[in-house]
Design a protein with these regions (language model features):
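Conserved acetyl-CoA binding element of GNAT-fold acetyltransferases
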Residues: 72-78
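Nudix hydrolase/Nudix homology domain
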Residues: 1-6, 135-183
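Residues that recognize and position ribonucleotide moieties
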Residues: 73, 100, 142
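Short glycine-/acidic-enriched loop or helix-start segments at secondary-structure transitions
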Residues: 22, 71, 153
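A short beta-loop-beta micro-motif enriched in histidine and acidic residues
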Residues: 68-69, 137
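Short, basic/glycine-rich phosphate-binding loops at helix/coil junctions
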Residues: 69-70, 145
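N-terminal leader/linker segments that precede catalytic domains of diphosphate-processing enzymes
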Residues: 1-68, 79-96, 100-131, 172-183
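Short glycine-enriched loop/turn motifs at secondary-structure junctions
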Residues: 74, 115, 134-137
């Protein structure tokens, strides 16, 4: 089952591609141009974000203003852009979606979601202020203590998994890096 729209034409020369094993020993069928030989790859997309938190344990969530899952709560996150590191992308998304000032921390969770062709990376990020300026993708940015988190109103399973891990680590007093596969 393909997760992406199939590539139909070569981006270099415009010739219709054929799907086959490339001649370089690759083990996956790829879109190969029969005219110029270009091999076209379709790989998972990286989603990068933060867990913005205050020392008292409250976390910042954003109420989505866009689809998918408009009107649901999420951590600030989005697709990584070309030319930026994962942590730069996470900081950018936090600024764009929440207008939050943060001090970036280490990677906290890496979640593989193969059914949608994505890898999600969340970083710990201490909030430097309780002032937020949500962007156009966010209806509201609000701080939540663990018992206040709207668990049934979270937009994505990756967000729920990450928050559960973060609160568990905080309770233990030690943060790790978590790798999760989501079927």
């Amino acid at each position: 089952m393909s997760l992406h729209t199939p590539i139909r034409h070569c981006s270099d020369c415009g010739t219709a591609v054929v799907y086959r094993l490339p001649d370089d020993g690759d083990t996956h069928e790829r879109a190969v141009c029969p005219a110029c030989g270009r091999v076209h790859y379709q790989n998972p997309l990286n989603v990068v974000g933060t867990i913005p938190f205050l020392p008292d344990g409250r976390v910042l969530l954003c109420l989505r203003a866009i689809e998918p899952r408009r009107g649901k709560w999420t951590l600030p996150a989005g697709f990584m852009e070309m030319g930026e590191t994962a942590s730069q992308g996470a900081a950018r998304e936090t600024d764009e979606e929440a207008g939050a000032q943060i001090a970036m921390g280490p990677l906290f969770s890496l979640l593989s979601v193969p059914r949608v062709g994505q890898v999600h990376l969340y970083y710990r990020a201490e909030l430097l202020s309780e002032q937020f300026d949500p962007g156009y993708e966010t209806l509201e940015a609000r701080l939540f203590a663990e018992h206040e988190v709207p668990w049934d109103e979270l937009a994505f399973r990756t967000v729920k998994e990450t928050l559960q891990l973060w609160f568990a680590d905080r309770q233990r007093g030690q943060f790790g890096v978590h790798c999760v596969d989501i079927a």
